[in-house]
């Protein structure tokens, strides 16, 4: 990816219409709506934006143009999911999506995850970061591997709604 850096800002309720459009994109829906619906995802995001969930949701922009969103959470706030992942209590989990079709396959996802990890580490130095894309999501796996995440396992995660095999990655605290 060349050009400006990824910028992150807290998502606001007005951003949900844009996220709705992105969730309707087949390539986003394929991975982000597994076992869920657009309305379910938007409801979860709205609760997080309103502070009713312990997840920070961020809008990602590239050159001041929104390109996707991401979120992070302390694994200890979601203990069932943390146990399912095999995450450590002090770990932080992440999710991310590139919503704009023209921005996929150009390094934007790699830059987004790098920016998100840097954001998390500014707030919580020394934490491990975990992610669990579907095992068949080769693009997401490449993004994580390019960001020094290490594959821990591939298996069904009970707390995931659709019963698919997930690739569980962790970026250790010392990875820069």
PLM region spans:
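Conserved GNAT acetyl-CoA-binding A-motif
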Residues: 122-132
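Conserved acetyl-CoA-binding loop-helix of GNAT-fold acetyltransferases
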Residues: 105-120, 142-146
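A short, well-structured alpha-helix characteristic of acyl/acetyltransferase catalytic modules
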Residues: 1-5, 10-46, 176
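C-terminal "cap" of GNAT-fold acetyltransferases
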Residues: 88-90, 154-176
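Conserved catalytic-core motifs of GNAT/GCN5-like acyltransferases
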Residues: 71, 76-77, 132, 150-165
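Acetyl-CoA-dependent GNAT
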Residues: 44-93, 97-103, 173
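Hydrophobic alpha-helical core bundles mediating ligand binding, dimerization, or RNAP-core interactions
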Residues: 19-23, 94, 113, 120
């Amino acid at each position: 990816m060349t050009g400006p850096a990824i910028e992150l800002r807290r998502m606001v309720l007005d951003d949900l219409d844009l996220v709705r459009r992105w969730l309707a994109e087949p390539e986003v829906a394929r991975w982000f709506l597994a076992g869920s619906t657009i309305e379910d995802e938007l409801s979860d995001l709205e609760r997080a934006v309103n502070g009713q969930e312990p997840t920070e949701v961020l809008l990602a922009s590239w050159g001041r143009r929104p390109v996707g969103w991401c979120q992070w959470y302390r694994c200890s706030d979601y203990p069932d999911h943390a146990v399912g992942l095999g995450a450590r209590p002090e770990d932080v989990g992440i999710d991310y999506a590139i919503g704009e079709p023209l921005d996929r396959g150009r390094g934007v996802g790699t830059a987004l995850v790098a920016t998100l990890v840097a954001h998390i580490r500014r707030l919580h130095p020394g934490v491990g970061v975990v992610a669990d894309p579907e095992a068949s999501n080769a693009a997401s796996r490449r993004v994580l591997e390019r960001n020094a995440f290490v594959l821990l396992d591939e298996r069904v995660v009970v707390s995931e709604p659709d019963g698919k095999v997930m690739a569980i990655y962790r970026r250790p605290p010392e990875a820069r």
